[in-house]
Amino acid sequence: MQWRALVLGLVLLRLGLHAVLWLVFGLGPSMGFYQRFPLSFGFQRLRDPDGSGPVGPPGGPAWLHRPRRGTEGRLETPPEPGPTPGPGVCGPAHWGYALGGGGCGPDEYERRYSGAFPPQLRAQMRDLARGMFVFGYDNYMAHAFPQDELNPIYCRGRGPDRGDPSNLNINDVLGNYSLTLVDALDTLAIMGNSSEFQKAVKLVINTVSFDKDSTVQVFEATIRVLGSLLSAHRIITDSKQPFGDMTIEDYDNELLYMAHDLAVRLLPAFENTKTGIPYPRVNLKTGVPPDSNNETCTAGAGSLLVEFGILSRLLGDSTFEWVARRAVKALWNLRSNDTGLLGNVVNIQTGHWVGKQSGLGAGLDSFYEYLLKSYILFGEKEDLEMFNAAYQSIQSYLRRGREACNEGEGDPPLYVNVNMFSGQLMNTWIDSLQAFFPGLQVLIGDVEDAICLHAFYYAIWKRYGALPERYNWQLQAPDVLFYPLRPELVESTYLLYQATKNPFYLHVGMDILQSLEKYTKVKCGYATLHHVIDKSKEDRMESFFLSETCKYLYLLFDEENPVHKSGTRYMFTTEGHIISVDKRLRELPWKEFFSEDGERDQEEKFVHRPKSQELRVINSSSNCNRVPDERRYSLPLKSIYMRQIDQMVGLI
C-alpha cells in the first residue's frame, strides 16, 4: 500500500507542477506555449534562433522571389514560409497583444498607438500644423515673393537658374510666376483664413503673368499652377462658401482666364509628336525648344487629364481634355501585351520604351492615380476600365509578400520594380513617391492592403525621422539620402484615417509633425533634408510643402473642417488641390468629342453617364464601412506584423 501511495503522490505532484507552469506561462490574452517552451514563447519568432536576423529564405526576403499568382492577381500560395504563430491558449494572433514574451495584456504597440487621442491633443496638433504652414508662408511672403520659392536657411528668394539651363531640378519647376504663392491658395481657404486668401488671390491676379521666357516642365506647371488656379476659382465661385466667405469683390473669373492662358502656352507640347504623347517641356513664350528631348516619363505625359479636363468642362472647350486624353490612350496602347504593364520612359516620336522599369514610384505614380481620379471627376467609363486593368497587372506582377495583410505567413506585402515585359525583378529599391499608393488604394476600397504598405513606409520614417528619396529594402538602407519635405506618406495617413477613424493614424501624424519640427525647421521656414541620417540640410523649401504636406497634416487633425462636414464630396489632385465632385464636371458642355484619330465622335458614343451613386469617393460612408468595426478600436495591423515590418527595415 505504501508504494501505491508514493506513486499517487508523485503523480499528484507532477500534475501540480504542470498546473503551476500553465498558470505562470499559459494564461493571459497574449501568451501561449511555443515549440521550444519555456525558452521562447509568444506568437511568433521573428528572428533566427541565434537572434541574428529576420527569419526568411537564404539571400534575403521572399520579395526577391516571384510568387505564384492566383486568378485574382494575388498570391495563390505564399512565398517562402516565414514565422508561424505558435499554438496555445490564444490561437491566432490578436490585434495589439504581446509578441515574443514580456507579460500579459497590451504590448508596446498597443500602448503607444491604440490609446485614445484626446480632443485637446488633437487641437494642439491641428494648431501645430497650421503654425507650420503660417511660418513657411509668412516667411515666403516676407523674404521671397514674388520669386518662385523660399530659401529658408538664408531667408531669400529663388527663381529659375538662368545661368544653367541644364539645371532641370530647378528649371523644370520654377517659371518666374510666384509659384509658392499660387500653389498655396487653396490651403489658405481650407484653413479658414479668408482675409489672407482674398489678399493672395488679388496678388496673383495683379502680379502673376505667364508671358515669360521660361522653359518649364509641362507636368509641373499643370499640377502646381494650373491645378491651383482652377481650385481657387472653384472655391471663390462656390455658392455654398463652406470655408467661410472666400468671395472676391468684383471677381470676373480672372483665375479661370489665367488658367486658360497658361494651358494655351502648354499646348505646343502636344504638337508635332507622332504618337500624341507630349514633349516634356515648353517655353512659355516660344513653344517647344528646338533642342527638346524626345523622351518623357509616363507620369509626366499621362497625368494631365484631371486639370486639362476640368479646364475644358469649365470653358466649354474640348481642346484641352482631348489632347490630354489622347496622350493617356497613346501610352495605354503601348503597354506590354504579356503583362499589361507600362514602362517609365518613352520616346514620344517612336513609341519605343526607353525605360522598361515598371513600378509605383517616380515616372509612373500619378499615371495610375489620374486614371481613377479622372473617372471619379468626369464619370468616363473608359478611365475606370483602364484603371481596373492596370490595378490587376500591378497586383499580378509588382506585388510581393503574403496574400493577406493581417493574416498568414511570409513577408509583408510590398510592391517592387519589375521589367514591364517579363515581370522580373529589376532592382531592390523603392522610392518615397510610392508612399502615395496606400491613399489610392483607400479610394478604391482596398483598405486592408493599404494598411500594410503604409505601415512599411511609416517604419522607414520612424527609423530616420523622414523618408529617404530611395530606400533599398534588401540592404535595409537608403540608396538616395535626401528628403525634400514630400507629402505622400502624410497624404496616405490622412486618407487611411478618414477610412478607418483609427487613432493609430493620428499618432502617426503626430510623429511626422514632430519630426518635421525637430529636423527641418530653420530660421525662415522648413528646409530639405540633404541627408536623412546626419540631418544636414539644403536651402530649399519646395512649394508642395505648403500646398500638400501642411494641408494634409492640418486636415488629419481638424475633424470639424468643412472638407469633412459640409456634405460636399471632394477630391484632391496629385498636387493636393481640392476639387468638389459635382454634376457639372460629369457633363460635357459640348455636343461632340474627338476620337483618338482626330475625327469627331458623337457624344453618345463616347461618353458613359454614370449615376451619382456609382462614383465612390473618399468621404463616402459606404467606402469607410468596409473596414471591420474592430479596426476602429484596435491596431489596424496586428502587433505581430508591425514588429515584423519594423525588423525588416532595421528599426529593431
Swiss-Prot record:
Q: Which terms does the UniProt entry file under GO BP?
A: carbohydrate metabolic process; ERAD pathway; mannoprotein catabolic process; positive regulation of retrograde protein transport, ER to cytosol; protein targeting to ER; response to unfolded protein; trimming of terminal mannose on C branch; ubiquitin-dependent protein catabolic process
**Source species, domain of life:** Eukaryota
Q: Principal localization? A: endoplasmic reticulum
Cytoplasmic topological domain ranges are: 1-4
Region feature Disordered, mapped onto this chain: 50-86
Tell me how this protein sits in the membrane. Single-pass type II membrane protein
Keyword flag Transmembrane? yes
Where it sits in the cell: the answer is:
Endoplasmic reticulum membrane
InterPro entries to which the protein is assigned, alphabetical: 6hp_glycosidase-like_sf, EDEM1/2/3, Glyco_hydro_47, Seven-hairpin_glycosidases
Entry keyword set:
Endoplasmic reticulum, Glycoprotein, Membrane, Signal-anchor, Transmembrane, Transmembrane helix, Unfolded protein response
Q: Please provide, in alphabetical order, the Gene Ontology terms of the cellular component aspect for this entry.
A: aggresome; endoplasmic reticulum; endoplasmic reticulum membrane; endoplasmic reticulum quality control compartment
Residues spanning the membrane: 5-25
- Give me the Lumenal side stretches, as residue ranges: 26-652
Per the UniProt annotation, where are the glycans attached? 176, 193, 294, 337
Q: Which SUPFAM superfamilies match?
A: Seven-hairpin glycosidases
What is an example of a GO molecular function annotated in this UniProt entry?
mannosyl-oligosaccharide 1,2-alpha-mannosidase activity
Which Pfam family is an annotated match for this chain, by its short name?
Glyco_hydro_47
Q: How does it assemble?
A: Interacts with DERL2 and DERL3. Binds to SEL1L. Interacts with DNAJC10.
Q: What does this protein do?
A: Extracts misfolded glycoproteins, but not glycoproteins undergoing productive folding, from the calnexin cycle. It is directly involved in endoplasmic reticulum-associated degradation (ERAD) and targets misfolded glycoproteins for degradation in an N-glycan-independent manner, probably by forming a complex with SEL1L. It has low mannosidase activity, catalyzing mannose trimming from Man8GlcNAc2 to Man7GlcNAc2.
**PANTHER family, sorted:** ER DEGRADATION-ENHANCING ALPHA-MANNOSIDASE-LIKE PROTEIN 1, ER DEGRADATION-ENHANCING ALPHA-MANNOSIDASE-LIKE PROTEIN 2
Q: Which family does it belong to?
A: Belongs to the glycosyl hydrolase 47 family.
Q: What is this protein called?
A: ER degradation-enhancing alpha-mannosidase-like protein 1
Give the originating organism. Answer: Mus musculus
